[in-house]
């Protein structure tokens, strides 16, 4: 049985952020009756605060989602940190309970022991393997330059790039966890069960 509870430090941070959001909601509720007050700015502030709460929680849960399926989760997160800092785009699929062979168009077979430097080198711009997805199973990189199914959901942000659409697409069809690094912003996220979560590593 997995332990999904938040750490004590994260509980405190999350509660503090929620309390601030509650105060802002109260201020906004009172401002509705005032003709000289605009609540749109307040709504944007609250949206930003709640997004930060989600990012905080998602960052914690990523380890809980990964650790039962690979002992190399720390190598994966280290690689993600470095790739993000350099704005090197990346797409990493972690196979969990369901096999992915029927869903992925296999690229180049590697069957290599997973290390952070190897992951980083695969996604180095110009590397022939960097455009597709890496498939991780247990503690091994099974293959690279894999092609994933793209989401067809009309609810997905139209500004999302191919990597993010591929991550969501595979997560809609399997229990895999897919990590993404944006090459435009360096922002990191993961897709699970058809939902994309922003994380800060």
Curated annotation (Swiss-Prot):
Residues 54-201 form the DAC domain. Transmembrane segments: none annotated. This is Diadenylate cyclase CdaS. The gene is cdaS. This strain no longer produces parasporal crystals, but can be made to do so upon transformation with appropriate plasmids. Optimum pH is 7.5. Probably forms a homohexamer. Keywords: ATP-binding, Nucleotide-binding, Nucleotidyltransferase, Sporulation, Transferase. Its cofactor is Mg(2+). It catalyses: 2 ATP = 3',3'-c-di-AMP + 2 diphosphate. Induction: First expressed at onset of sporulation, maximal transcription at 18 hours during sporulation in mid-stationary phase. Under control of sigma-H factor; in B.subtilis is under control of the sigma-G factor. Its EC number is 2.7.7.85. Belongs to the adenylate cyclase family. DacB/CdaS subfamily. It is an enzyme of class 2 (transferase). Disruption phenotype: Spore formation delayed by about 2 hours, about 20-fold decrease in spore formation; 2-fold decrease in parasporal crystal formation, 30% decreased c-di-AMP levels at 18 hours growth. Double cdaS-disA and cdaS-cdaA mutants are viable, but neither double cdaA-disA nor triple cdaA-cdaS-disA mutants can be made, suggesting c-di-AMP is essential. GO terms for biological process: cAMP biosynthetic process; sporulation resulting in formation of a cellular spore. The N-terminal region (residues 1-69) is required for activity, unlike the B.subtilis ortholog where their removal increases c-di-AMP production. One of its GO terms (molecular function) is ATP binding. It comes from Bacillus thuringiensis (strain BMB171). One of 3 paralogous diadenylate cyclases (DAC) in this bacteria catalyzing the condensation of 2 ATP molecules into cyclic di-AMP (c-di-AMP). It has slow DAC activity with ADP as a substrate and may have weak ADPase activity. Required for efficient spore formation, whereas in B.subtilis, it is required for efficient spore germination. It is produced under the control of different sigma factors in the two bacteria. It is also required for parasporal crystal formation. It comes from the Bacteria.
């Amino acid at each position: 049985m997995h332990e999904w509870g938040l750490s004590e430090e994260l509980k405190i941070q999350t509660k503090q952020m929620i309390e601030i959001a509650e105060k802002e909601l109260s201020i906004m509720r009172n401002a509705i009756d005032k003709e000289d007050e605009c609540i749109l700015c307040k709504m944007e502030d609250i949206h930003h605060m709640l997004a930060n709460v989600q990012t905080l929680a998602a960052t914690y849960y990523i380890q809980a989602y990964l650790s039962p399926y690979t002992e190399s989760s720390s190598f994966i997160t280290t690689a993600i940190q470095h790739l993000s800092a350099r704005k090197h785009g990346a797409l990493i699929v972690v196979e969990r309970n369901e096999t992915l062979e029927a869903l992925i168009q296999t690229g180049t077979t590697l069957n290599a022991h997973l290390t952070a430097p190897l992951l980083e080198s695969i996604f180095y711009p110009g590397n022939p393997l960097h455009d597709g997805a890496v498939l991780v199973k247990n503690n091994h990189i099974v293959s690279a330059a894999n092609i994933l199914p793209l989401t067809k959901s009309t609810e997905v942000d139209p500004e999302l790039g191919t990597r993010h659409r591929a991550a969501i697409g595979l997560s809609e069809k399997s229990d895999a966890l897919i990590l993404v690094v944006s090459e435009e912003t360096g922002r990191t996220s993961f897709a699970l069960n058809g939902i994309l979560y922003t994380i800060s590593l």
